Amino acid sequence: VRLDAVYRRDPDIVFRKISGECILVPIRRRVGDLDNIYTLNETAARIWELIDGRRTLAEIRDALAAEFAVPVQEAERDLLEYLAALRACAAVKEGPA
């Protein structure tokens, strides 16, 4: 994964905050997709918000490091780990919005 890459969210997955929890919900027409609702921690929720089809992964990493007051290496590790999970469930794709 290149840090100069840009990712965009799948428009068929929506982000919701319900009772203090952040979740991703597929809105595709297949009923089986409803079994795939994902609960996000605070960092993962912020990464989802920052993946907008305009920011590079490096820009997202730097924003996370600043917002959560963590070392850049830790922010990068968290970003790449969550990005791998998002790619595995096809919630994001590489390329501009």
Per-range role (PLM):
Residues 30-97:
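Long, charge-rich, low-complexity alpha-helical segments
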Residues 1-31:
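Long, low-complexity, charged/polar intrinsically disordered regions in eukaryotic proteins
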